[in-house]
């Protein structure tokens, strides 16, 4: 195995985006309903694509069901442990640190596993269909990806719903303060 610029540049870009993802997901995040709605759409399309792919390998539906159950379990736990904070007129939110750690660990472990597997088996990728067959033999990656997709769809939907109520309550309190003066 030798390192070339062809493999170093993508690795640097991937590491940069992983760093941004980790930094953004730990701690308070600004409440941006438009971004949350975009996240719902993207993860819904991703989950739909995984569901379609599972039609080729029907045994993967079991892993998708486990991903759904795990994702909803994390959403349920995150709903119970969400906290909001107001700074300089903006609303920030965060969920429990263990939910964030579980998601990051699952994502990073499966991501690194798949990248390592692809790097080690790169000569086999010249054959048509070998990548699809390698995914079919590793259903845990699909289950984990579906778990993450279900979590982000459910949690983002919950935050959007909660933020509407929070913003309405905030506007009501503002009007009440103005009338009290």
From Swiss-Prot:
One of its GO terms (biological process) is sporulation resulting in formation of a cellular spore. GO terms for cellular component: plasma membrane. It comes from the Bacteria. It is a multi-pass membrane protein. Its main location: membrane. It is found in: Cell membrane. Keywords: Cell membrane, Membrane, Sporulation, Transmembrane, Transmembrane helix. Induction: Transcription is activated at hour 4 of sporulation, requires sigma-K and is repressed by GerE. Maximal expression depends on SpoIIID. The chain crosses the membrane at residues 5-22, 35-57, 61-78, 91-113, 140-162. This is Protein csk22. It comes from Bacillus subtilis (strain 168).
């Amino acid at each position: 195995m030798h390192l070339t610029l062809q493999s170093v540049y993508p690795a640097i870009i991937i590491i940069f985006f992983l760093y941004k993802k980790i930094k953004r997901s730990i701690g308070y995040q600004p409440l941006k309903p438009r971004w949350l709605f975009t996240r719902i759409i993207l993860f819904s399309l991703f989950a739909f694509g995984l569901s379609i792919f599972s039609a080729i390998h029907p045994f993967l539906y079991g892993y998708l069901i486990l991903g759904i159950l795990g994702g909803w379990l994390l959403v349920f736990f995150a709903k119970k442990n969400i906290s909001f904070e107001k700074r300089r007129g903006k609303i920030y939110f965060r969920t429990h640190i263990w939910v964030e750690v579980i998601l990051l660990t699952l994502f990073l472990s499966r991501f690194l596993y798949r990248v390592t597997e692809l790097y080690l088996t790169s000569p086999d990728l010249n054959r048509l269909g070998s990548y699809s067959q390698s995914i079919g033999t590793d259903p845990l990656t699909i289950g984990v990806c579906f778990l993450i997709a279900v979590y982000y769809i459910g949690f983002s939907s919950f935050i959007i719903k909660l933020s509407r109520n929070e913003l309405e309550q905030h506007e009501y309190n503002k009007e009440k303060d103005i009338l009290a003066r």
